[in-house]
């Protein structure tokens, strides 16, 4: 019989119970005991759901109260030096992730090319030790519910160290962890663990080539020291970087991604690289929400089965990246809904595929195929769109000329101050929006409320003496979902939440058909805000690449076509804003770097397509219209040429948590356009000191001209509280004025 498994399950819960529990603890509304009890209740519920889905191996250790990499850091005593004197408890754990009054938070980076963020481990000569065997505790807890189906899951030592910062000697760092992993594994085996899943996704990246010898040594050590353990060497998000070497590791099974790494991994299977090994085949897309093509997938599984000692079917990666279930999405078009598969439905899919492979007939298998075919044939996927050959893809003049024209119009001071776009969304805002959605208040009442918030924050910004203002985005729940509600080809869900970082959950829209601009999206609120002040107010849009990367995108057409469709829609909205007198328009490409393929050989094509779509969106404006863009946490050195090629008049970049790493990208490369490198971290409630912000302004000015530098927070301020937001912006403005004075002298 073919087995079925999973790599990980969503933490949030069907109604975001996980998020609400953690935030209640942060707010002091529940005790530590309540937090731990609530977390256990959720864990056990998730285990039972997977047991009832018919899984043969159920992941344990994927659950976290913030981030699974942070869990390892605290477990292995890789605690940042600035927190070293604090007791090792849950409050320290959250402080490392979020910061506190005394110390800044650790860096946060994207988990490979997903929209999930992990807390970067900081090495600073700590002595690794096992503070607790958390995985053993969770395994013993799980055995009470699922018995011997419990499968411990842990990120492997090579990936963990590769994702760290401050590592002076990679080999020494890995070696220092091996006795700790050995103890964890030994205790798990003694407790009855059959399989142990060790995640090593670094080996699907180009960087993984540098660690092949380390992999040989590490897994030889585990095989010798824990001989009774059955290890699954698990990778995802791409194909193995070197299957010839890695397939020879002394492990029992290999978990491979046959969705995003299909070409390389299938070739390795066909050539017999994994002959005699168990294969855990990731054939269900764990990162997107479309139902699987059972016809193609069943044929693929037959090929894999022929070349493996034993086959287990599973999703391509952890289901952390998709919502929990479609069962509550009753408002969706039936053709669309029947073509979707969230986490629970994906578990059903792996079970049905296994039963079909074993020769068991099931009418549900054939019904699944019928639903899949109906979606592919739907009319909304075959719309005639604007001819791209008639669309401008280059600004009329170069940046130097545009800058002079824009400055003559805007009269901005040296080091202009601004924010990224959103302001705090209070409980009152959320409550009023919900009342409007339920029909408890009228459209007119809701509009009046939103306008009152806009006016209040315009006055706050004027009082703070910011130079370029924003309307605050109070009408938006999410920067991508908002546009998904307004464009043809998109739909939104009621409960389609996924974790982005910590307790931050997002509800990505679904791009199910061809995309078109239907009506003004942002014009009314932006024009109203501009009518209240003589200072420029930015129009706030989300760019085509970010909309795509932060949505559940359709996969039946090439990505560049989808980029271009959305670029055309954003172009139409930009033109409406420009015609309405808005002089500065920000087109956020927060997720440009996030979508970058993990392999360098695939990156140029993606970046070329991304730049082209941005040009489609922004190149039809006049020289006097200033185009801004914004980007989130990224390794920018590898995409600096693409950033320059966007030809945005000003780019703002999230930098403060990088502790200087991102700034170095712009210190070593000539960047001629306007730029704002975030001067304080908005992901932490901590208010920066003026001295910190002054330093964060002055450091990039060693390389960048003051005439091109803008001063702004790291990112939007929607998730912050109003008092801390105003306090931090006061510091930002005061620091900017101090630096201006120094420059003037």
Swiss-Prot record:
Chain sites annotated for binding L-methionine: 420-422, 473, 588
Broad enzyme group: transferase
rRNA processing listed as a keyword: no
Pfam family of the protein (one): Meth_synt_2
Keywords: Amino-acid biosynthesis, Metal-binding, Methionine biosynthesis, Methyltransferase, Repeat, Transferase, Zinc
InterPro entries referenced in this protein's UniProt entry, alphabetically: Cbl-indep_Met_Synth_N (IPR013215), Cobalamin-indep_Met_synthase (IPR006276), Met_Synth_C/arc (IPR002629), UROD/MetE-like_sf (IPR038071)
Enzyme Commission (EC) number: 2.1.1.14
Binding site for 5-methyltetrahydropteroyltri-L-glutamate: 19, 115, 478, 501, 504-505, 550
Necessary cofactors: Zn(2+)
HAMAP family: Meth_synth
Name of the protein in question: 5-methyltetrahydropteroyltriglutamate--homocysteine methyltransferase
Organism listed in the record: Streptococcus mutans serotype c (strain ATCC 700610 / UA159)
Gene label: metE
